[in-house]
Amino acid sequence: MIKWLTRPADYAPVWQDMRAFTAGRGAATPDEVWLCEHAPVYTLGQAGKPEHLLNPGAIPVVMCDRGGQVTYHGPGQVVAYTLFDLRRAGLFVREYVRLLEDAAIGTLDDFGVPGACRKPGAPGVYVPLGPAGELAKIAALGIKIRNGYAYHGVALNVDMDLSPFLGINPCGYEGLVTVDMAACGVRRDLVDVGQRLAERLLAAMPEPAGATR
């Protein structure tokens, strides 16, 4: 099931709704993907270090229960929250992370963004930038798994103001360059990109016999 949330969405209520959905689901609960475009916010994961918040300015900061460091969400970025039953699908964490990355890479390829790839030791999706082909981040991952149920998900930069990323060390990496699809010469509607990403995510989930989605 794919569900679009009200745009722009405040981060904290969406996070709490994910937690409530996860706490209330059972073995037969269908998987869902929630798509949204957030109001500007910095989020700090469980490993987040305050020193990676360089200059937050007026943008609110929310500490949350996903893995990872600090990132930015805001208008022009589509976030796909993946409420998936990993135990039912028979997926381990590493396989699940790869599934998220593959879905983002496939979506970028679908819309004509060239060269999307992984970067060893740095989760997320990257694209080559400039003559030297330096890898710049275009999609970030953050997950939480509770009793075999996953929530949080993947954020893909479509066409956004990238300047707030200068106020942080994105994902804890000093000097990491962040880009969006528009910077790669591809301007597409955020809803279209989000829908394709969600479809790829759901299609990639192994579905045991008799399961519903």
From Swiss-Prot:
Subcellular location: Cytoplasm
UniProt-listed PROSITE patterns: BPL_LPL_CATALYTIC, LIPB
Protein name, UniProt field: Octanoyltransferase
Binding site for substrate: R66, G67, G68, Q69, V70, T71, Y72, H73, A140, L141, G142, G153, V154, A155
Function: Catalyzes the transfer of endogenously produced octanoic acid from octanoyl-acyl-carrier-protein onto the lipoyl domains of lipoate-dependent enzymes. Lipoyl-ACP can also act as a substrate although octanoyl-ACP is likely to be the physiological substrate.
Pathway(s) it belongs to: Protein modification; protein lipoylation via endogenous pathway; protein N(6)-(lipoyl)lysine from octanoyl-[acyl-carrier-protein]: step 1/2
Other information: In the reaction, the free carboxyl group of octanoic acid is attached via an amide linkage to the epsilon-amino group of a specific lysine residue of lipoyl domains of lipoate-dependent enzymes.
Catalytic activity: octanoyl-[ACP] + L-lysyl-[protein] = N(6)-octanoyl-L-lysyl-[protein] + holo-[ACP] + H(+)
BPL/LPL catalytic domain sequence ranges: 27-209
Site (Lowers pKa of active site Cys) location in chain: K137
Lineage: superkingdom: Bacteria
HAMAP family per the UniProt record, alphabetical: LipB
Gene3D superfamilies the record matches: Bira Bifunctional Protein, Domain 2
Pfam family, any one: LplA-B_cat
A GO molecular-function annotation: lipoyl(octanoyl) transferase activity
Major localization listed first in the record, in broad terms: cytoplasm
Organism: Bordetella petrii (strain ATCC BAA-461 / DSM 12804 / CCUG 43448)
